[in-house]
Amino acid sequence: MAKRLLLTAALAATTLAAPVIEERQNCGSVWSQCGGQGWTGATCCASGSTCVAQNQWYSQCLPGSQVTTTAQAPSSTRTTTSSSSRPTSSSISTSAVNVPTTTTSAGASVTVPPGGGASSTASYSGNPFLGVQQWANSYYSSEVHTLAIPSLTGPMATKAAAVAKVPSFQWMDRNVTVDTLFSGTLADIRAANRAGANPPYAGIFVVYDLPDRDCAAAASNGEWAIADGGAAKYKAYIDRIRHHLVQYSDIRTILVIEPDSLANMVTNMNVPKCQGAANTYKELTVYALKQLNLPNVAMYLDAGHAGWLGWPANIGPAAELFAGIYKDAGRPTSLRGLATNVANYNGWSLSSAPSYTTPNPNFDEKRFVQAFSPLLTAAGFPAHFITDTGRSGKQPTGQLEWGHWCNAIGTGFGPRPTTDTGLDIEDAFVWIKPGGECDGTSDTTAARYDHHCGFADALKPAPEAGQWFQAYFEQLLTNANPPF
């Protein structure tokens, strides 16, 4: 299952004078690693690119500068209570970051909603994707325009520009994103809606910051540990999200809750980290569902995918687990159902089973949700579904095994977001994983290396999870179905 570190505050890196010619010959090429904790290779970039610190583990040569540069520590453009794991080049900008703020006594930046706050509540009934437009992720759009397109020409550049316009979910994968990208995006949506957007825009986001996150893998470990007060920190993170949702109650907001977390509770309880995290995961998921149960909010719990929970041995226990969470949270009206195939590659409705899915009878996402739905209903959770089709365009993929989740070869952008799913329990096809952001590094010496990213069916060389992966974006674009 793909692992992710996405959507943190926009940060900038300063540039130093070019080193001598002899050093320049050994500098990294564009997109290569140029620094980070434990890195022993070149710490400068060839002419035409800049070494930008992405997080403490990884710096990357990004296009933009016309001189050779050396890795520099980023400096935040905003006052926050937490440092960002995913700073970006100063060439990446998004209007979502530039929002009016005030400072609390704790020093955290807090958005002041323009125009005096909400004048109404964006309540709804039934399918929350009906009657609204999904908001295109401005951060992802900026990545495509500033990182992808400069390396492309002709039809590929034109197609890439079209990708940037497709709505995709924005990830709150660090505490710092809540009072920056999240609140800023809500401010942008409010401005667009007040300017007459018809139908109005809805915000689409992923809540993804559990302590001891990603308990069964290494590629996208989170910022908090359960042993170091992580539960209290997570509750404060959820409380901040709630604060902004209340401030922007005039905006319908759709949330996917904690990819991978509960699915790991079904299949990976043999992993010590998952055993230790299980009770906390459940407690904090229930807390999030209760706190975010607001009339303008719709929530979908992440439920893995057909190749994870769709197996006959897993699907029954999964239904019991999700129904239990639903009941423990008090059957929140804003919990609409489950999200499937997040950051994965499965097709929706296939005529035949890919070889790597055998012998699972639920070899695509449609079969999975149709098998899952009656079990959930019988357990007391009448769930609806959304499915991530962002990387499902090419079927079969180049995966050698179904569980090979990292930067899989032979994949393409898939069906565009729509409510025309042909299935009453399926609310929408959506793009949850922004295509082109890496699943995990192939560098075996990296602190967050996961062995799945070194398999023969994983595209290499790959940067750290969440960093821009130009070769992967081009693969998705080339194999897009329907094409751009």
Swiss-Prot record:
- Disulfide cross-links: 34-51, 45-61
Q: Cite the residue spans of the region called Disordered.
A: 68-98
Sites of glycosylation?
175
As for PTM, the annotation reads: Both N- and O-glycosylated.
Renumbered to this chain, region (Substrate binding loop 1) spans 208-230
Q: Tell me its EC number(s), please.
A: 3.2.1.91
Q: Temperature behavior, per UniProt?
A: Optimum temperature is 55 degrees Celsius.
- Which intervals of the chain are annotated as region Substrate binding loop 2? 431-469
Activity dependence on pH, as recorded: Optimum pH is 7.
Q: Which family does it belong to?
A: Belongs to the glycosyl hydrolase 6 (cellulase B) family.
Q: Which PROSITE patterns match?
A: CBM1_1, CBM1_2, GLYCOSYL_HYDROL_F6_1, GLYCOSYL_HYDROL_F6_2
Q: Which reaction does it catalyse?
A: Hydrolysis of (1->4)-beta-D-glucosidic linkages in cellulose and cellotetraose, releasing cellobiose from the non-reducing ends of the chains
Q: Where is the signal peptide?
A: 1-17
List this protein's GO terms for biological process.
cellulose catabolic process
**Ligand binding (substrate):** 171, 173, 305, 308, 344, 405, 433, 437
The UniProt record lists the keyword Secreted: yes
The protein, known as: 1,4-beta-D-glucan cellobiohydrolase CEL6A
CBM1 domain residues: 26-62
- Keywords, alphabetical: Carbohydrate metabolism, Cellulose degradation, Disulfide bond, Glycoprotein, Glycosidase, Hydrolase, Polysaccharide degradation, Secreted, Signal
Molecular-function annotations in GO: cellulose 1,4-beta-cellobiosidase activity; cellulose binding
Q: Is-annotated flag, keyword Signal?
A: yes
Q: What class of enzyme is it?
A: hydrolase
Q: Report one GO cellular component.
A: extracellular region
- What is annotated as the active site? 260 (proton donor), 439 (proton acceptor)
Q: What is the annotated quaternary arrangement, including any partners?
A: Monomer.
According to its UniProt entry, what is the function of this protein?
Exoglucanase that plays an important function in biomass degradation by catalyzing the hydrolysis of the non-reducing end beta-1,4-glucosidic linkages in cellulose and cellotetraose to release cellobiose. Hydrolyzes crystalline and amorphous cellulose but is inactive on hydroxyethyl cellulose, mannan, galactomannan, xyloglucan, arabinoxylan, arabinan, xylan, and pectin.
